């Protein structure tokens, strides 16, 4: 999987905020990536329509979570491991 696909994978079961996506990369994906690079990827994925921001709640770090769009869910279904 590429880094954007790992972001999709982190969101498949539930909405996640930035901090949880960073933790996913550290703990699950075990990929070295900077927080800044994750921010850039998230921004690109928002623009591309793969994810959206869920403004209905914030986490303890005052971050809104991200959700998969239908386009993002379809992209996740087509990930080749």
What is the meaning of each model-derived region?
Residues 59-62:
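Short acidic/glycine-enriched loop/turn segments that link adjacent beta-strands
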Residues 1-10, 81:
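Short alpha-helical segments that sit at the start of domains
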Residues 64-81:
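Short, amphipathic alpha-helical interaction segments positioned at domain boundaries
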Residues 46-56:
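A short, conserved structural fragment
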Residues 31-48:
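Short amphipathic alpha-helical interaction segments
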Residues 13-14:
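Short helix-capping/turn signature of helix-turn-helix
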Residues 17-28:
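Short acidic, hydrophobic short linear motifs in intrinsically disordered regions
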